Amino acid sequence: MAMNPLTVPSLPRLSGIGDIETRVILKKLARAHQALAELKGVAASMPNQSILVSTLSLQEAKDSSEIENIITTHDDLYRSDSASHHFVTLAAKEVHNYAVALRVGFEKVKRTGLLTLNDILEIQAGIEENRAGFRKLPGTALKNDKTGETVYTPPQHEGDITALMADLERFINEPGDCDWDPLTKMAVIHHQFESIHPFYDGNGRTGRVVNILYLVQQGLLDTPVLYLSRYINQHKADYYRLLQTVRETGEWEAWLLFMLEGVEQTAGQTTALVVDIKAQMQQVKHRLRSELPKIYSQDLINNLFRHPYTKIEFVASELQVTRQTAARYLDEVVALGLLSKHKRGKENFYLNDALFARLANVNSRRDEA
């Protein structure tokens, strides 16, 4: 029976949903797992995976924030610096907040093996820079941006929200609850989180962080490098339509296929991106070692790929050299043609042009190259 969006829905406990892994879903799961396994293997072959966490988490943050109409350019994003609290625009600041929350959540999940309500609360607090916690007051309704029509009313009462989130926490962390594939569970977890809509703000971005961290918790990824938000952003209308279809009909197949297609597509795109970044690092390593042996170091190479826009203070800090030495290193790399130098105000930025161009075009896959 179709639900009236103006009435408060009674969301199901997750253990009571039933068997939703149809034959079509099982076939799609196999393809999605193959793509994820390839991405995991390629990422593990990187000599320093922290480079991927730093660089690709910003890319994911940008795409996830665009779903919420928080738009920033790659230029503003990479010229901003969350460590020094310098942000070119407010949008860049919000994107950096997301990336930091993702990295902090990743470190916690890797350390504990759990993804708890406290972790989710911390992620949302980092994204929104407030500690309002779960909703305590009624009145939240999701509306069509264009018409203003209410399309969905999530649970309104604090007790219901708390109970549903506790149920979600158990579902995430206790594998004995059901024998679904982890990717099926990820799609169901995401749907349930979006439907509970537990926060006043930041639900979408927090939910997409939970997606990535759940894949890490389940061992499907070692690092949070899957570009699922880009796929959702490209198919935003279908995303919201299918979320609502499950709420109204209880039919899961189309939603699961949508999310699994997203995993398969974005895993392939991200695999191609990681392969290209690794190849670029090897090329830079060869050039520096052969043409600038006096300044060559793996730490310098790591810096140039951790920060698409690097700065003198980044190099000085990470290589433990003086600012004067760091400036000389960067100018020599510029002279070699591996970086371009840009002055903004009183500050110089050094752009890794090849990396920047590749990050701005993550849609390509290796089989399309």
Where are each of the predicted segments found?
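FIC/Doc superfamily catalytic core
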Residues: 1-369
